[in-house]
């Protein structure tokens, strides 16, 4: 690898980070153009003189080597007509990124000068070490949370929201798909807030600008997954207004019609004590609108029963909401004080037996709803990802079922050799039975 670094100390640090990553991945750094298989030019675009110096350096690298990736401030700069300056002057460059774009630069390097994977010398595969079955994986897009829910201490442990660079996220997703992952589960503490901390900064992926924002990321992940015949599933989607933008993507098949939205409660006074959005009526309207746009949508949520000060009337509001909203998958926890949570200081703490009794009543209603909704699937043919095959047949999951937390689809043993299936494969299953949690069917 050849490297040219121009500009201010901030650009120098960017160069150091890129070179560090290159060396960590086994790329050697050449001091000459003719000794390099590829050249990275980190540019400056602050003043006209710096722009010209950067353009000259790019031209020299193209003349002397011919394979050039451009990064830095000039990479993000446009001319009066709105065209990228670098691409307009030097159309032969292989890729262009803006500043502070380690992920985008490395993705371009991997595209144009792949480092061969040698199983005898490389101890870590490109997709990384995973503890899940090889056909599904979790993709964390951010760390931390900006909310201060009174029952939660995650911000004190993990800090405020820090979004991963969008190109870094996309590169990891691509590596996972290449490694055979058939289901990508997008996670974070607050998936909907992705990019808020960087003001939805525009990054680059495959030579195209891509905003650091949930809607744009989900669309790009869906497009990438389609190339590998894979699923994308969204988790921990805080109910911001822009979540409404995701539903059309689900109805169009870009990502699974599955939304994990942690609602926590339905009574406005309880939600206020929780420091959560406090308009259950609006939430119900949104759920109706989502299902109108995407009728096959599965909604999962989690709730807390027995929160400090919760009255029987407030709890009944929650039960009524669950029955009316007909949420497909729910989990409910009896409130438990967590050391450091501000909810511990709220008046009206309920006895353990009351909290547990309310949780049990909640789950009774939720299971009745689940049984009704699952019964409607009998007779349908569902696409199922097989997780396991044994002598009794197969066990898999439909688009409505996330691993570990939702239901399963039990698949009868194949009657013919042509119907045989393996773990990690998709099969079409005719549903023949259902209970309150799981489905049964045959290929």
UniProtKB/Swiss-Prot annotation:
GO cellular component terms given for this protein: cytosol
Localization, UniProt: Cytoplasm
Residues at which [4Fe-4S] cluster 2 binds: 145, 149, 152
InterPro entries tied to this protein: Elp3/MiaA/NifB-like_rSAM (IPR006638), Methylthiotransferase (IPR005839), Methylthiotransferase_CS (IPR020612), Methylthiotransferase_N (IPR013848), Methylthiotransferase_N_sf (IPR038135), NA-bd_OB-fold (IPR012340), Ribosomal_uS12_MeSTrfase_RimO (IPR005840), rSAM (IPR007197)
UniProt-listed Pfam families: Radical_SAM (PF04055), TRAM_2 (PF18693), UPF0004 (PF00919)
EC number assigned by the record: 2.8.4.4
Cofactor(s) it depends on: [4Fe-4S] cluster
Cofactor binding comment, as recorded: Binds 2 [4Fe-4S] clusters. One cluster is coordinated with 3 cysteines and an exchangeable S-adenosyl-L-methionine.
The reaction(s) this protein catalyses: L-aspartate(89)-[ribosomal protein uS12]-hydrogen + (sulfur carrier)-SH + AH2 + 2 S-adenosyl-L-methionine = 3-methylsulfanyl-L-aspartate(89)-[ribosomal protein uS12]-hydrogen + (sulfur carrier)-H + 5'-deoxyadenosine + L-methionine + A + S-adenosyl-L-homocysteine + 2 H(+)
Radical SAM core domain mapped to chain residues: 131-372
Functional summary from the UniProt entry: Catalyzes the methylthiolation of an aspartic acid residue of ribosomal protein uS12.
Descriptive protein name: Ribosomal protein uS12 methylthiotransferase RimO
């Amino acid at each position: 690898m050849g490297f040219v670094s121009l500009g201010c100390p901030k650009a120098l640090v960017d160069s150091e980070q890129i070179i560090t990553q290159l060396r960590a991945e086994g790329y050697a750094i050449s001091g000459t153009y003719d000794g390099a298989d590829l050249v990275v030019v980190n540019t400056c675009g602050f003043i006209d003189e710096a722009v010209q110096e950067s353009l000259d350096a790019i031209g020299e690298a193209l003349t002397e080597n011919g394979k050039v990736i451009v990064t830095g401030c000039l990479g993000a700069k446009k001319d009066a007509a709105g065209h990228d300056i670098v691409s307009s002057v030097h159309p032969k460059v292989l890729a262009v990124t803006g500043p502070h774009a380690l992920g985008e630069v490395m993705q371009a390097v991997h595209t144009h000068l792949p480092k061969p994977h040698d199983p005898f010398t490389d101890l870590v595969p490109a997709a990384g070490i995973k503890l899940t079955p090889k056909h599904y994986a979790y993709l964390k897009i951010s760390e931390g949370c900006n909310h201060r829910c009174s029952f939660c201490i995650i911000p004190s442990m993990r800090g405020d929201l820090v979004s991963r660079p969008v190109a870094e996220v996309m590169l990891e997703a691509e590596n996972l798909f290449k490694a055979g992952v058939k289901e990508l589960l997008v996670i974070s503490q607050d998936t909907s807030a992705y990019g808020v901390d960087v003001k939805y900064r525009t990054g680059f992926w495959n030579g195209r600008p891509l905003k650091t924002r949930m809607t744009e990321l989900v669309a790009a992940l869906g497009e990438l997954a389609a190339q590998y015949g894979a699923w994308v599933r969204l988790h921990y989607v805080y109910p911001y207004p822009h979540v409404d933008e995701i539903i059309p993507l689900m109805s169009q098949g870009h990502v699974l019609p599955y939304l994990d939205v942690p609602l926590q409660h339905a009574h406005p006074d309880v939600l206020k004590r929780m420091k959560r959005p406090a308009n259950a009526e609006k939430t119900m309207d949104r759920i109706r609108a989502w299902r109108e746009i995407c009728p096959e949508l599965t909604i999962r949520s989690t709730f807390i029963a027995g929160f400090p000060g919760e009255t029987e009337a407030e709890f009944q509001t929650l039960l009524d909401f669950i029955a009316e909203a007909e949420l497909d998958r729910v989990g409910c926890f009896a409130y438990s004080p967590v050391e450091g949570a501000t909810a511990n200081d709220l008046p009206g703490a309920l006895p353990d037996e009351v909290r547990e009794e309310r949780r049990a009543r909640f789950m009774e209603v939720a299971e009745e709803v689940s049984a009704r909704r699952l019964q409607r699937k009998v007779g349908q043919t569902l696409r199922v990802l097989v997780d396991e095959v044994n002598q009794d047949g197969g066990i898999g999951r439909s688009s409505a079922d996330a691993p570990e937390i939702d239901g399963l689809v039990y698949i009868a043993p194949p009657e013919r050799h042509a119907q045989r299936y393996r773990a990690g494969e998709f099969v079409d299953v005719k549903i023949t039975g259902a209970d309150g949690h799981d489905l049964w069917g045959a290929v």
